[in-house]
Amino acid sequence: MITRLSGACLRRSGAKRNWPREHLVHRSLLASFSTTQRVLKCSVGPFRTSNVVFKSKEPKDNKPLDNKNDPKKTHNEDESHTNESLPSTDKKKKKDNDDFKQNLKSSSNKTEEKYSATQASKSKNDEFELGGEENEDEMPLNGEFNKNVPAKYSVPDVYPQLLALPIARRPLFPGFYKAIVTKNPSVSEAIKELIKKRQPYIGAFLLKDENTDTDVITNIDQVYPVGVFAQITSIFPAKSGSEPALTAVLYPHRRIRITELIPPKEDADSAASSDAAELETDKSSNLSSNGEVKSDLKQDNGKEEPEKEVESTPSILQNFKVSLVNVENVPNEPFKRQDPVIKAVTSEIMNVFKDIANVSPLFREQIANFSISQTSGNVFDEPAKLADFAAAVSAADHRELQEVLEATNIGDRLQKALYVLKKELLNAQLQHKINKEIEQKITQRHKEYLLTEQLKQIKRELGQELDSKEALVTEFKKRTESLSMPDHVKKVFNDELSKFQHLEPMAAEFNITRNYLDWITQLPWGKRSVENFDLDHAKEVLDRDHYGLKDVKDRVLELVAVGKLRGTMQGKIMCLVGPPGVGKTSVGKSIASALNREFFRFSVGGLTDVAEIKGHRRTYIGAMPGKIVQALKKVQTENPLILIDEIDKVGKSHQGDPASALLELLDSEQNSAFLDYYMDIPLDVSSVLFVCTANTIDTIPPPLLDRMEVIELSGYVSAEKVNIAKGYLIPQAKAACGLKDANVNISDDAIKGLISYYAHESGVRNLKKSIEKIFRKTSFSIVKEIDDELNSKEKSTGKSGKKTSPQSSEDAANKEASSVPLKVPDKVNIEIEEKDLTKYLGPPIYTSQRLYDTTPPGVVMGLGWTPMGGVSMYVETIVKNILSSNSTPSLERTGQLGDVMKESSEISYSFSKSFLSKHFPNNKFFEHARLHMHCPEGSISKDGPSAGITMATSLLSLALDTPVPATTAMTGELTLTGKILRIGGLREKTVAAKLSGMKEILFPKSNLADWEQLPDYVKEGLTGVPVAWYDDVFKRVFSNIDAEKCNNLWPNLIKSSSKQHQISPSH
């Protein structure tokens, strides 16, 4: 920074200075200049070998307009006062010295004498001295390049040709030091040579591309045209990476502009190497030539020697591969000090400096040094320097700073400097705000930490509370006393507990280890519930909760019997498959109750993350074990019953395949060492009884299905639904609606009507909803009737209701909520009949059990299976056009049929042609008929291998113009040879046929064993007809057919066009 105390450096000594307390301010002021004076002293220390003093020739063309005739103010208002410049007159110097002495007079006599001696040694007017006496503890910074450099220079006013040095990122401003690093060997040698030849001046110009790193200008467009005329004050050997480099400290004096670029010579390197030896021998010689710079040698006796011309820059640098430029000075435009715009902008800059100084200590020191360095006491006298200082301390964009440098109009320069300074203020304020917030947070946390530790210590001293970590360790150890941990688990627990004891509560791993120890000590190691092997008790519980379900109940009783013989019950994996609403989930609870096991249920429907089954790694934030470990923690036994619901709806995503994770869990050979990712220790879940539920087994992966024992639960027939409604659903619904002891009942006919017209599905879920709706409406009517009676009595007695305040109403409501339930009067007797269902439930949902009471030719009822249960499905076939001898045969299929059913229709069509030509050779129906086959309810997709005989019968019925009995249904797949294949879901299809009012059902003979296993109440009212070939089907459904008539049915119609016959469903 610029300083007025450049006449003598502040010396350092080993002696301790005892400054008076009241003069600490002066000591701080002196210390603030120590760094600047050290740079000056070190940079000019090597110049002490010579007493050469150069006359200072200050530019005369930059004077303010109002100072034109003032002989005392001949210096440039912008760049004439450098860091080393002294006051211009002895009178001013003396006044400054006296003032400064007066300020330091009270500190100590010794300091005052030393300062006076230093001031007395200053040189006379227009001379400036770079540094004072040598100090032993201050080493020169420029090493070996300091022996023959002149100590004092007179800065030349005109220096037309210079070494051009490109500067990156930000420009230099007159009056402010800047250290640069040169990596180019030629440039480094040229700088050294300039110092040796006592011409340490260069031109510094800003590169336009801030990412460019070069020391030589090859094109004038690389740099901005306006730069600074700078003096090399000192040089240092440096190292940039693996290459040697040179650091040079520059002091800019004034602005210059490039007029011409002289690019480096290609053959300069060889010439430079040839002159290296010569330059070494002339280190102490004073070369002279007809150069632009002249110097006066000043001997120790004070006599001046004649000026000697110094070698010109081109001749010095002609052997170096460097860039030279011809330049011209860029003077400031004349300005008026009293210009209101300049004064206003200067004042605003000072205000901004004050604001920055309030938030940035670094800026505060720089501003203080700058204010002291001013030659005039008033900053308004030097606005140009103020603008340069504002730009020099701002971290603005290089283009904005270059604009400040190029501005010659002082007002314009001040405004541009104010702009970049305002940006610096915003940056400083933001940084100050961030630092303040961070300090507040750190202070608050530190305060909380100290208070917390003090509170812990106080409580520990009072014996009121143990340390939280010690309390946790004690709790963990206490839990393990009642557990029978396996050896490998005990080892893991001890290791984790030991690590936990050495962790600090503020450590990141503290909570992770604590949670892990909490989980490992809350698992039921060695705890088992006592199982009940009483068959009668198990049968009683199962019958109490569910009607029917003989297969499930028999399997549970078998499990109890085996457990009783062995003395223990091993875990099993069962899968209950059936349509919704048949009681799969509720039967799992009954099994747990019958076996005296704890029950836990979780659903895997739509599950896509394998971590839900096997847990997360402990390295994740918020990690936790999987569902199995959570179940064991909740039930606190090793042998619960875990129900895995909706196992057929497991999803799959990029997070893994949960179905594959279940393979290890649901395998009795592997689940004795089930590994949860969070626990990371083998868990024995072989004693767990796993019960899975599904609507279909088609979507269960085969490897998973193979590990489970599948038990099918078919839909309920009407008789079963009636018993379930009377024994289970109605009592539950009455209790839920407050009618448990009321005389409100639903007749058997109403229940049957409810099943037939409102709850036609395979399960009983809709039946339960309908019954609950009936009792809710009944409860409403009873309560309303009671309230109406009470109101009528009050009116008859003349008692009117009292008005109550909101508070009393609220109290009454609370009292009513906590009062005893309302008892239904004994006189209430409601019997709900079938005719009342419309009143409670609205119009019937299912108006008819089947579409056709009398089926026309071509219409046959088939039976299908869905995950929702069995369904009845009609197959309709008609002739599209009038049958004629010119017709082309075809078959069109509709009804959203799947690929399997489309193939079945093709097989049936081909088989029907073959069968008709074999048994009725004169019937040419299929040779001329354009047919359309349809399965009603086209919005529902249909597929499956069991509609072959139904489609073939529909085609033959149309070809023979003979209807099939309306009460006959059939199911079975057909081959081209007429063989009928085995089908699945016979129970569900039988239930669907019975619900549709069928009397006869045809099924494959290979399913005869399935038919015989059906309960009698399912087969009641149905005649089962097993068939092995289609001939058996044809004989059964067309038993009364006239073969001769059917054989000759169509030829007469085809020959006679006047008697064309059109087939229609009403025929």
Swiss-Prot record:
Region described as Disordered: spans on this chain: 55-142, 262-314, 791-820
Localization terms from the record: Mitochondrion matrix
PROSITE patterns listed in its UniProt record: LON_N, LON_PROTEOLYTIC, LON_SER
One GO BP: mitochondrial protein quality control
Pfam entry (one): LON_substr_bdg
EC number assigned by the record: 3.4.21.53
Transit peptide residue numbers: 1-36
Residues reported to bind ATP: G578, P579, P580, G581, V582, G583, K584, T585
Domain of life of the native organism: Eukaryota
Alphabetized Gene3D superfamilies for the sequence: 1.10.8.60, 1.20.5.5270, 1.20.58.1480, 3.30.230.10, LON domain-like, P-loop containing nucleotide triphosphate hydrolases
Xref: SUPFAM superfamilies: P-loop containing nucleoside triphosphate hydrolases, PUA domain-like, Ribosomal protein S5 domain 2-like
Self-association state and partner proteins as the record states: Homohexamer or homoheptamer. Organized in a ring with a central cavity.
Family according to the record: Belongs to the peptidase S16 family.
Name of the featured protein: Lon protease homolog, mitochondrial
Organism: Schizosaccharomyces pombe (strain 972 / ATCC 24843)
